[in-house]
C-alpha cells in the first residue's frame, strides 16, 4: 500500500508510547510503502532533529533516507491544492506523483484538497488509517 505521511503523523508514530506506533511498525515491516519527495524528506529531517536526541534522530533519518524503506518521488507538477498552508502542498504533490493510495494527516489544512474532484487523493486521519491497517493485517 502506497502512502504519503504528513510530518505531524510521522513524528507522532515513531515512539512506541503513542497510539499511532502501529503506523511506524507497518512502515518498518514493509506492510506500507512510504513515498516522499526531497522537500518532504527535508521537512522530516528538520522536525525529527527538533523532537529527538541527536543519536536517535540520526537513526530515524538513516531509515527515512534508506530506499529499502522510503521511495523517493520526483515532483513534476505543482497542484497548489492547499491554499491555507502552502507548505503542505508538497505532501499532496508527492501523493499525486507517486499514485499513493492515501495521505495520512491530522492537519485540518488538507480539507480543501479533499474536496477536489481532480486529482483525487484520499486524505485520511491517522485514526482512520489505523483502522485500515487493522482491517488489512489483523485477519
Give the location of each predicted region.
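PIN/NYN-family metal-dependent endoribonuclease catalytic core
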Residues: 5, 21-49
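Metal-dependent nucleic-acid phosphoesterase active-site entry motif
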Residues: 1-17
Amino acid at each position: 500500500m502506497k502512502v504519503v505521511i504528513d510530518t505531524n503523523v510521522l513524528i507522532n508514530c515513531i515512539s512506541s508510547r503513542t497510539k499511532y506506533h502501529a503506523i511506524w511498525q507497518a512502515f518498518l515491516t514493509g506492510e506500507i510503502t512510504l513515498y516522499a519527495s526531497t522537500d518532504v524528506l527535508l521537512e522530516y529531517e528538520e522536525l525529527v532533529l527538533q523532537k529527538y536526541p541527536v543519536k536517535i534522530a540520526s537513526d530515524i533519518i538513516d531509515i527515512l533516507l534508506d530506499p529499502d524503506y522510503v521511495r523517493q518521488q520526483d515532483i513534476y507538477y505543482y497542484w497548489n491544492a492547499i491554499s491555507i498552508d502552502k507548505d503542505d502542498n508538497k505532501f499532496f504533490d508527492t501523493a499525486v506523483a507517486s499514485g499513493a493510495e492515501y495521505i495520512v494527516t491530522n492537519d485540518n489544512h488538507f480539507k480543501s484538497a479533499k474536496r477536489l474532484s481532480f486529482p483525487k487523493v484520499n486524505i485520511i486521519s491517522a485514526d482512520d488509517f489505523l483502522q485500515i491497517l487493522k482491517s488489512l493485517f489483523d485477519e
